[in-house]
């Protein structure tokens, strides 16, 4: 492993395999992928982890419904996730499954560490359990059924509003209650541990309300990782699932190589999660790590839900198959293409809040930003360069001060402004910085009128200057849009004969104005973003 570069470790949640991947799972994964690609371009040695959460009662029920064993069911689902991630250009470095031997080993090692820590005890659980969310609830947390949710008198999950099961079983408990003050201190000393900031307020309020010890083993079913010192118990699914982040970087493996990898990679810089699992990642997970003396992740970024407008009520509703309002990823790909898909969800939907989506808005954003602005700039500029300079780029100007150069002025400091936004996952803000250059370049064409300059031999130097600047703006914009749209950005560089630059890990250096060699062949090609009718 090359440890000469700084490590950057980013994760998605590992996804339940009770159903096929959907827009929500794709959303989390693309958020992480964009950050991973950006960090690679900025010189980091990136570890990007995703995977599948394959244990628990919910998975066992889904398998039984399909007439399979749980292992057969999870094996049948893994290709669906991998195929979608490949289609969406996800660049994960590892894909972990909790049924893998490495996860079994790590979880059993965790049990031994927890036993030694003194934060584990055996007791009996008597309370409510939500199978779909794999979550325990106390009597005071339970929602009573009403006319809107469930039936009157039913005990419902306060999060998903589905009926709860009453569970009574012997269990091992993790002393989560012992970590209330430690967690509040963590939030005080590291206010950016939970992002966005308003999510931190939610987490803090929950912890301040008091913590109950957590049941971390089950005896009423057997689809899980066995507790090493008690054969009748299997691991509670979240106690298992959360550990995947450390399993993937060598936790519990007794070799020099694994210990070196863990020391280099851990802690993670970002866990990307949905807001519905924030308590597991910002309360239970750090408490578990504190109990066994391990470092905490630097940031947990919780994004909102994707919502659609209910035509009857006019209200925004979370997408779900049960509501019948879910949109399949393939439907969006068919409309926008993969790169348009990535661009829309990463720049028009604010990651920290719930995002209302619609096909009308997708078309509007695609046409305005990609077809009319970015794609149009590429087509017009390459066409003029090929037409006026025999299929090549003009020579590099001897001086960038010979004529007015508004694009170079915008490019000055652009990378720094862009990186400041990307560092905090503000992809929409980063896009705005790049689009300022793209819009300016389109205006530059209209203001400088290259077609008029081409008719006057005395204006040959100015024409070359204008076209060079347009091509250089395209080159820099392509690098900055690469994390969002890797294929079309690489294609734009190829058409400039700059394809070797696509693998650069020096973003600041490669985006220095004036690096375009000049004189190289250029290719107009077909439109990268055909306008949607």
Role assignments for model-derived ranges:
Residues 117-180, 184:
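Cys/His-rich short segments
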Residues 371, 375, 408, 412, ...:
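Generic structural concept
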């Amino acid at each position: 492993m090359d440890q000469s570069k700084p490590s950057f470790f980013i994760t998605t949640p590992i996804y339940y395999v009770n159903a096929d991947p959907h827009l929500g799972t794709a959303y989390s994964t693309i958020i992480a992928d964009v950050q991973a690609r950006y960090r690679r371009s900025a010189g980091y040695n990136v570890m990007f982890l995703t995977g599948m959460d394959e244990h628990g009662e919910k998975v066992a029920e889904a398998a039984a419904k399909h007439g399979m064993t749980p292992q057969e069911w999870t094996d049948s689902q893994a290709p669906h996730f991998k195929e979608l991630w490949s289609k969406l250009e996800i660049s994960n470095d590892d894909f972990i499954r909790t049924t893998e031997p490495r996860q079994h080993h790590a979880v059993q090692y965790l049990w031994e560490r927890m036993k030694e820590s003194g934060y584990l005890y055996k007791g009996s659980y008597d309370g409510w359990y939500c199978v779909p969310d794999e979550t325990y609830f106390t009597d005071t947390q339970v929602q009573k059924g009403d006319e809107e949710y469930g039936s009157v008198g039913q005990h419902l999950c306060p999060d998903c509003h589905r009926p709860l099961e009453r569970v009574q079983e012997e269990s091992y408990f993790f002393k989560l209650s012992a970590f209330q003050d430690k967690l509040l201190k963590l939030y005080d000393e590291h206010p950016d541990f939970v992002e966005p900031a308003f999510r931190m307020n939610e987490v803090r309020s929950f912890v301040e309300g008091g913590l109950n010890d957590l049941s971390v083993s089950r005896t009423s079913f057997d689809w899980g990782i066995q507790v090493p010192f008690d054969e009748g118990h299997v691991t509670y699914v979240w106690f298992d699932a959360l550990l995947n982040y450390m399993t993937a970087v060598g936790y519990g493996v007794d070799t020099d190589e694994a210990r070196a990898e863990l020391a280099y990679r851990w802690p993670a810089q970002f866990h990307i999660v949905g807001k519905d699992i924030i308590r597991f990642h910002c309360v239970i997970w750090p408490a578990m790590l504190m109990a066994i003396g391990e470092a905490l992740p630097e940031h947990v970024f919780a994004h909102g839900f994707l919502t659609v407008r209910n035509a009857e009520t006019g209200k925004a509703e979370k997408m779900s198959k049960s509501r019948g309002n879910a949109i399949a990823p393939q439907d969006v790909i068919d409309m926008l293409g993969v790169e348009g898909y990535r661009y829309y969800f990463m720049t028009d939907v604010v990651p920290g809040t719930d995002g209302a989506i619609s096909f009308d808005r997708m078309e509007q954003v695609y046409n305005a930003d990609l077809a009319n602005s970015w794609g149009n700039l590429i087509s017009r500029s390459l066409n003029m360069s090929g037409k006026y300079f025999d299929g090549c780029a003009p020579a590099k100007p001897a001086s960038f001060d010979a004529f007015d150069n508004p694009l170079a002025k915008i490019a000055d400091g652009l990378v720094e402004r862009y990186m400041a936004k990307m560092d905090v996952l503000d992809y929409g803000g980063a896009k705005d910085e790049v689009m300022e250059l793209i819009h300016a370049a389109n205006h530059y064409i209209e203001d400088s009128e290259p077609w008029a300059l081409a008719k006057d031999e005395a204006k040959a130097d100015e024409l070359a200057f204008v076209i060079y600047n347009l091509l250089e703006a395209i080159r820099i914009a392509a690098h900055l849009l690469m994390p969002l749209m890797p294929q079309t950005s690489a294609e734009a560089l190829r058409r400039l004969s700059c394809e070797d630059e696509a693998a650069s890990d020096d973003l600041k250096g490669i985006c220095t104005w004036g690096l375009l060699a000049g004189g190289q062949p250029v290719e107009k090609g077909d439109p990268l973003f055909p306008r949607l009718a």
